[in-house]
A protein has these predicted regions:
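Serine-hydrolase catalytic machinery in alpha/beta-hydrolase-like enzymes
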Residues: 2-108
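Conserved alpha/beta-hydrolase "acid-adjacent" motif
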Residues: 34, 169-175
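Alpha/beta-hydrolase fold nucleophile elbow
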Residues: 107-117
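Short beta-strand immediately N-terminal to the catalytic nucleophile in serine-hydrolase-like folds
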Residues: 115-117, 142, 163
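Gly/Ala-rich beta-loop-alpha elbow adjacent to hydrolase catalytic centers
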Residues: 116-121, 125
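A conserved short beta-strand
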Residues: 134-146
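Short beta-strand/loop motif that positions the catalytic acidic residue
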Residues: 161-164, 168
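C-terminal catalytic histidine-bearing segment of alpha/beta-hydrolase fold enzymes
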Residues: 174-227
Length: 227
């Protein structure tokens, strides 16, 4: 069942024009509001970033008519490794449309756009930049995985920052480790942070780790252009 999509937008600090666009994608069963605290923490480190926090495309829960049910980007009902990729591919054009629209509205180019996703939202972010190489300059994916690892010859222009809990029992750290190896083999800039005592959660420490990696990546890219 589809739902009306709600999108929260927050501009940069008043004295800062929007130099970056950060799009936050929530976990399955949550909603856009669940990512707003993380969005504000990121803006504390990046005051010139415009924040966009959309809700998933479909409702999640047993009573889909209830206003209290959560949202999801693609259905998890009957989800398997065999059908996961097809379900994601079905919604990727809408993800691209959403991000392109926000880039136009905020006048921020793709190379200064960052997708920040948790769990299902992180998977959608990873698959989006795999499908559309020029969609965003970076991805920060928390407790997430590729539906299908990038294969030899895959073009990916985004910097990828993976943050994962060492004790994640929902999405095993093995997925993040495999993703990091595959990306490194494609010469894609990638970082992997395993927080050993963390389960499947988006904590303050994880947010700080991801935002720091993002800041370091932006600095390194700027430094490279000066040489």
């Amino acid at each position: 069942m589809l739902s009306m999509q709600q999108v929260y937008r927050f501009g940069p600090a008043p004295e800062h024009p929007a130099r970056h666009l950060f799009v936050f994608l929530h976990a399955s069963g949550a909603d856009a509001r669940s990512m707003i605290p993380a969005a504000f923490k990121y803006q504390g480190r990046f005051p010139s970033a415009a924040l966009v926090v959309p809700s998933g495309f479909a409702r999640y829960g047993k009573d889909l008519r209830s206003d209290k049910c959560g949202q999801q980007w693609f259905s998890t009902s009957g989800l398997t490794d065999e059908n996961r990729m097809a379900r994601i591919c079905a919604i990727l054009p809408r993800i691209e449309q959403l991000i392109r629209r926000e880039q136009t509205n905020h006048r921020v180019p793709a190379e200064r756009t960052v997708l920040i996703g948790y769990s299902q939202g992180g998977t959608v972010a990873l698959e989006a930049v795999k499908a559309f190489p020029e969609l965003a300059g970076a991805v920060v994916a928390y407790a997430a995985r590729f539906a299908r690892l990038p294969q030899p010859g895959t073009r990916m222009d985004s910097r990828i920052h993976l943050v994962h809990g060492g004790y994640d029992s929902v999405v095993s750290r093995v997925y993040a480790e495999r993703a990091a190896r595959a990306l490194a083999g494609l010469h894609v800039p990638v970082t992997l942070d395993i927080i050993e005592d963390l389960g499947h959660a988006l904590t303050h420490e994880a947010i700080c780790r991801g935002s720091l990696r993002l800041l370091q990546g932006i600095y390194e890219r700027r430094r490279a252009t000066l040489h």
